[in-house]
């Protein structure tokens, strides 16, 4: 049996059985490597060699956690909570409470979508924005699974559909790799071809709102490094300045210089808080350490996920899976489209990145689509949807690790059952259905 299928399924089954995701990824990597013929020594080497693949993101998260913890000293989180409580009003005022829920969901959705294009910081906003809002979610009895679905939608749908920010990178990769495989398509056609698959994600978002709209109670707990702090207009102003400086540095480094900006952005924000006197010298060390600990688990998962991905790549069974599936299709367009989408789902679930999936699948899928008689627009829809499938729902993807990092800050949100399973159901299933429809109608 294919090593990728075995590794991914084993990792998913163990995760669903509530085995720690780090352990599940390691066991899945070992099983995949041994099944793929690498041998124990080569498997372990491939795993350890790959650990550094997500090192930058892991360190970025640690720094952002430190920045988020330091922001608590300005009193900004408490000011946000007080303002929201005033907005909510009396607990018996159910209409006002419902409107507050809608407003918060819309704000989080807009911020998440903008993080992919308008202010392309990707997941960097989550550790700063979400932990302070947990008290508000508790006050409103909001189901955090809904928030996870909203954030994940914002992290994925915009880059699939819109040719700006991360979407420009995704669609540029799609065009270039399709051209390398023998099919030249205009860049301007790609968003139109992906409208139907993304419409499926919109349907999934609406369904998640319907399913998770009911109240759910959580215990209000103190977050490490987030004890209540008195605040003034000056301290709130400094907090806003620190956030603006942090975002400014990130955008300058990533957009102007073309380098990763999260680490230096978080550092710049910390410097503003330190120089302003909001963060005292005698408490800075413990505060920053507490913030880093807050994000440590997500960092470890990202590191191990990179090792897992490297093992699957080294087996050569990723390409083998694509070629084997092509042999089952025959001349059936409907079966071909469905199998290509499912193969894309399996690969992205294992690799944890839709961007990394594109080069793997285009080399086989483009000639196969041409052989089956699919139009260029249908081919774009199949490959785009196949690559995007699994980004939502994969335990190793930053599109799920990001939401979990913020929502689990008080230990009451499970990565697999509260983020991965809901996002898998509400986004991957509609994406398969609507991607399949797009392939047949375009």
From Swiss-Prot:
Superkingdom of the source species: Bacteria
Main subcellular location: membrane
Pfam families in alphabetical order: Na_H_antiport_2, Na_H_antiporter
Transmembrane segments: 21-41, 51-71, 103-123, 146-166, 190-210, 236-256, 259-279, 292-312, 335-355, 364-384, 421-441
Subcellular location per the Swiss-Prot or TrEMBL entry: Cell membrane
GO cellular component: plasma membrane
Keyword annotations from UniProtKB, A to Z: Cell membrane, Membrane, Transmembrane, Transmembrane helix, Transport
Residues making up the signal peptide according to the UniProt record: none
The keyword Manganese is annotated on this UniProt entry: no
Topology relative to the membrane: Multi-pass membrane protein
This protein's name: Putative amino acid transporter YuiF
Lineage: Bacteria, Bacillati, Bacillota, Bacilli, Bacillales
UniProt gene name: yuiF
């Amino acid at each position: 049996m294919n090593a990728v299928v075995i590794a991914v399924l084993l990792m998913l089954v163990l995760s669903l059985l509530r085995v720690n995701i780090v352990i599940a990824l390691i066991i899945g990597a070992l099983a995949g490597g041994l099944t793929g013929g690498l041998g124990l020594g080569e498997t372990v080497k491939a795993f350890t060699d790959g650990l550094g693949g997500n090192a930058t993101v892991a360190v970025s998260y640690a720094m952002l956690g430190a920045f988020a913890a330091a922001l608590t000293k300005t009193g900004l989180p408490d000011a946000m909570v007080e303002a929201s409580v005033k907005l909510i009003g009396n607990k018996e005022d159910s209409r006002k409470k419902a409107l507050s829920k809608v407003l918060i969901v819309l704000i989080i959705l807009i911020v998440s979508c903008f993080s992919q294009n308008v202010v392309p910081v990707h997941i960097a906003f989550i550790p700063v924005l979400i932990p302070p809002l947990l008290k508000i979610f508790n006050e409103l009895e909001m189901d955090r699974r809904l928030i996870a679905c909203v954030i994940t939608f914002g992290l994925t749908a915009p880059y699939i559909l819109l040719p700006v920010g991360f979407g420009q990178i995704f669609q540029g990769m799609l065009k270039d790799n399709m051209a390398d495989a023998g099919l030249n398509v205009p860049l301007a056609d790609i968003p139109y071809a992906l409208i139907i698959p993304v419409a499926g994600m919109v349907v999934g978002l609406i369904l998640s709102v319907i399913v998770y709209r009911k109240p759910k109670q959580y215990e209000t707990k103190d977050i490490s490094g987030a004890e209540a702090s008195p605040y003034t207009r000056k301290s709130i102003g400094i907090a806003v300045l620190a956030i603006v400086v942090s975002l400014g540095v990130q955008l300058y480094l990533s957009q102007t210089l073309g380098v990763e900006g999260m680490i230096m952005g978080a550092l710049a924000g910390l410097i503003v808080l330190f120089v302003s006197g909001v963060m005292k010298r005698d408490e800075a060390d413990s505060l920053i350490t507490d913030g880093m600990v807050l994000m440590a688990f997500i960092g470890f998962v990202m590191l191990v996920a990179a090792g897992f991905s490297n093992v699957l790549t080294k087996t050569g069974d990723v390409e083998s899976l694509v070629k084997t599936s092509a042999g089952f299709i025959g001349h059936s367009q409907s079966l071909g489209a469905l199998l290509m989408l499912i193969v894309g789902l399996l690969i992205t679930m294992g690799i944890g990145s839709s961007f990394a999936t594109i080069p793997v699948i285009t080399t086989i899928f483009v000639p196969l689509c041409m052989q089956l008689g699919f139009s260029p627009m249908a081919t774009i829809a199949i490959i785009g949807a196949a690559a995007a499938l699994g980004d939502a729902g994969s335990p190793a993807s930053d599109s799920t690790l990001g939401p979990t990092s913020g929502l689990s800050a008080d230990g009451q949100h499970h990565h697999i059952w509260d983020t991965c399973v809901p996002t898998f159901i509400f986004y991957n299933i509609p994406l398969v259905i609507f991607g399949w429809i797009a392939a047949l109608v375009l």
